[in-house]
Regions:
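Charged substrate- and nucleic-acid-binding regions of tRNA-handling and nucleotidyl-transfer enzymes
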Residues: 50-56, 117-168
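Divalent metal-dependent catalytic cores for phosphoryl transfer on phosphate-bearing substrates
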Residues: 1-126
Length: 168
């Protein structure tokens, strides 16, 4: 796996984010008049609390930032589409702008959280819709990468070899 810092791999940080992502739920719990339980702000507060835990465990600044971002934005992949079937290009752009290099990790955290939250009550049609929306975001991200940095068709080394030129 990809080592990030301090000998820790990216997948380790994702697992830590999975473990700690709902750490702020007890302190953010509210009950609406109709009895519905909500956890407003738990993602942002949880990111801060998790970073404190990782600080005490001597994780690097970079690792704390990565886990913090994964936790802060873990609900966003499921919210990007809104009422639509798929998210807008603008929503996808903003998501990756905000999550930086942990955008894909955060999507995996979101999928795991969604499955765990629904548990045995998971409705396959709803899961299919959620998974398709998230898959679309990933496809758009990889398409963008191939457009932003397309493979070189020919290099200076190729030209030197083809025309028998010397460098310089």
């Amino acid at each position: 796996g990809e080592e990030v810092a301090s000998g820790h791999e990216r997948k380790t940080l994702l697992k830590l984010a999975g473990l700690l992502h709902d750490i702020a739920k007890p302190q953010t719990r509210t009950t609406e008049e109709i009895g519905r339980i909500r956890f407003f702000g738990h993602a942002k507060d949880g990111a801060t609390m998790a970073q404190g835990v990782l600080e005490r465990l001597r994780f690097s600044v970079r690792e704390k930032e990565m886990v913090g971002k994964m936790i802060e934005y873990h609900l966003r992949p499921g919210q990007m589409a809104g009422d639509e079937e798929i998210p807008t290009q603008r929503a996808i752009y903003r998501y990756f702008r905000d999550t930086g290099d942990v955008g894909i990790d955060t999507i995996f955290l979101n999928l795991a959280d969604h499955l765990a939250t629904q548990g045995p009550k998971l409705e396959l049609e709803e899961w299919r819709k959620h998974a398709q929306s998230v898959a679309y975001v990933l496809e758009e991200r990889f398409m963008e990468e191939s457009i932003v940095s397309p493979p070189k068709l020919i290099s200076g080394h190729d030209l030197i070899a083809i025309f028998g030129m010397s460098p310089g």
